[in-house]
UniProtKB/Swiss-Prot annotation:
Protein name, UniProt field: Endoribonuclease YbeY
Purpose: Single strand-specific metallo-endoribonuclease involved in late-stage 70S ribosome quality control and in maturation of the 3' terminus of the 16S rRNA.
Xref: SUPFAM superfamilies: Metalloproteases ('zincins'), catalytic domain
Keywords noted in UniProt: Cytoplasm, Endonuclease, Hydrolase, Metal-binding, Nuclease, Ribosome biogenesis, rRNA processing, Zinc
Chain sites annotated for binding Zn(2+): H107, H111, H117
NCBIfam families linked: rRNA maturation RNase YbeY (TIGR00043)
GO biological process terms on file: rRNA processing
Annotated HAMAP family: Endoribonucl_YbeY
GO cellular component: cytoplasm
Amino acid sequence: MSSPEGSSVTFRRAPATLRRPAIERFARRLQKEVADGAPFDTLITGDAELRRLNRDFRKKDYATDVLSFPSGGPGLGDLAISLGRARAQAREFGHTIEQEISILMLHGVLHLLGHDHEVDRGRMASLEKRWRAKLGLPTGLIERVQS
């Protein structure tokens, strides 16, 4: 549930080298610029927890990189991001783990705003690409799948 003062990031599993303040600042920036001020909360955790959440809520028994849980009330909702998936994808695509977490967070926020790239004929992909460029992020999730 989103905190009253704004978006928050909880690091359940994170190495000491992870630049937490940068990720927290990015969450606040997303809240302000992309979500029109609506707060959301992000949990950064391990593959096992993402697998459990994916299985419990989507009936898909595998770890995924990001899950979105709309709130239906005040605030946008919650995101869960796999640190393991983020680390692997950052390595694969040649950028930092903080950039990958930011890409995943943007993708998740767009889902919280009601966009669904699986059915919207490219609308979410277009939004993600536009926001990614504006926010200075490397290639986004949808673009990777489409290329």
